[in-house]
Every structure is written in C-alpha cells, then in structure tokens.
Amino acid sequence: MILDDLVTVTKIRLARHQRQQSLADLKQTVAKMPRNHKPDFLTRLKQPGLHVIAEVKKASPSKGTIVTDFPYLAIAKAYDQAGADAISVLTEPDYFNGHLHYLKEISQQVSVPTLRKDFTIDPYMIYEAKANGAVIILLIVAILTDQQLRDYRQLAEKLGMHAIVEAYTAAEVTRALQSGAKIIGINNRNLKDFRVDFNNSLKLRAMVPDNIPVVAESGIKTQEDVEKLAAAGFNAILIGETLMRSNQKRQLIAAFKERA
C-alpha cells in the first residue's frame, strides 16, 4: 500500500533529521521564534463563506511530476494575492518532491497561514513544522493511534498552531471527533491506493457537528464541485493539482471563492 510506503520513508527521513538536529536544539529554535502575527486559521474558518487552502505541490505518487516548472515562491505569492485563506506546502521529498525549505521560504513571504503537508508521525515533526514557519499541521487518522491524535493536536496548540485531523472513512471521522479535533479534513483520496471518490466527503460531512469546521480535500476540479461542497456545508476546500496545472491560478481561486 502506498500509505505504508510513505510512512516507512518518513521514518527514515525523521531519523536522519534527528541525527542532524536534536529535539532539544529544535525546541530552542522554536522558543526563540518571534510571535506569529498571521490571521488565526481556526477563526477564519468559522467565518461565513467557503475558504480556500491552496496547495504548492510539484509531484504526487499517483500523477508523478505535476509541473516541471516550479517557481514555488511565485506560486505561493500568487495564491496569497488571489485571496487564498491558507497555503499548503508539501514537505515530503520522496513521493511528492517536497522540501522543508519550501515551507520556510513561503511562510516568510506570504501574509496567510501556512500548512505543513506531510505525514506527521512524531512530535519532532511538529516542532520542525513550527521552526519552518507553519502554523497548521496535518494529522492523518489512518497512521496514528488515538493517543497520538490527541497528544499531537495538543502539542500543536501549545505551540500556537492548529491541526487538521484528516479522515477518509466513517470510522476515522468518529476517531477524529473522539480525539477532540477542532478542525476535521475529509479526504476524497484513499491513501492506501490513491484512488479518488469525490462523493466521499459529501457522504461523510453530516457526521461532523456544525460547530467544528470541515475541510474537503482532493479531487476538487470544477466550479460545480466547489458549489456542491459549499451547499453541503463545508467550511473550506484544499486544492492542489487543479491549481498547479492551471495557468490562471489567481483567477481560479477568485472564481472558486466567488461561486461558493
């Protein structure tokens, strides 16, 4: 399964990073960071309208290289100027061609919150996300225990960050809710085989109480898709490949927000 492979390479990368910089040193780096002055992501999600998390992504396991020309800073700035509410940055290198320095540079250059899009499997990665400018992390229910889901979210909040707790099945949505998640992501992509079912998020949306913001992820391509998700009561959409392939990124974000 692709997800198992992703976790395996993440463990190898984590061990390498831990050898390069100890957790104690990383904590010191985080402690010295200036206060974040970007808009609070959770507060923004609770405001009316459908919010857009625009993703900076060069490749994926299912599609391979999505774009060969990858001016990641220019892309992120275009998203910011177009009115994106947050910017998701892939930092997984082996399957997504991501890198932590993309996150750090983008975080320094945009006015909106940034999400570290990766496979968080250890507290070290949460401190690492913070040290590189992220104010949002992703916690994937399928790869974490109930205790980890709760502990990692609480650690993120202690560091002044938010966690999107991502589910794909009804059972995972239940676990996300039981863990105390304050933001839930419903993925249309099955991370075990990377197949997409757009209706997955529509089917599971009703499981989440209205007081908890919900983000729809993956397979969102058209204005009709966006309108369906808005009508179903989603608070936000995360869009990656569709934006990355577009030559009119700013116009597309503006259109999605306007039509919703």
From Swiss-Prot:
Instruction: Give me any GO biological process, just one.
Output: L-tryptophan biosynthetic process
State the protein's name. Answer: Indole-3-glycerol phosphate synthase
This protein's species is Lacticaseibacillus casei (strain BL23)
Q: Which reaction does it catalyse?
A: 1-(2-carboxyphenylamino)-1-deoxy-D-ribulose 5-phosphate + H(+) = (1S,2R)-1-C-(indol-3-yl)glycerol 3-phosphate + CO2 + H2O
Q: What class of enzyme is it?
A: lyase
PROSITE patterns the record matches: IGPS
Alphabetized UniProt keyword annotations: Amino-acid biosynthesis, Aromatic amino acid biosynthesis, Decarboxylase, Lyase, Tryptophan biosynthesis
Question: Molecular function (GO) terms listed?
Answer: indole-3-glycerol-phosphate synthase activity; phosphoribosylanthranilate isomerase activity
> Entry's InterPro entries?
Aldolase_TIM, Indole-3-glycerol_P_synth, Indole-3-glycerol_P_synth_dom, Indole-3-GlycerolPSynthase_CS, RibuloseP-bd_barrel
The biological pathway it contributes to is:
Amino-acid biosynthesis; L-tryptophan biosynthesis; L-tryptophan from chorismate: step 4/5
Which EC number applies?
4.1.1.48
Q: Which family does it belong to?
A: Belongs to the TrpC family.
**Source organism's superkingdom?**
Bacteria
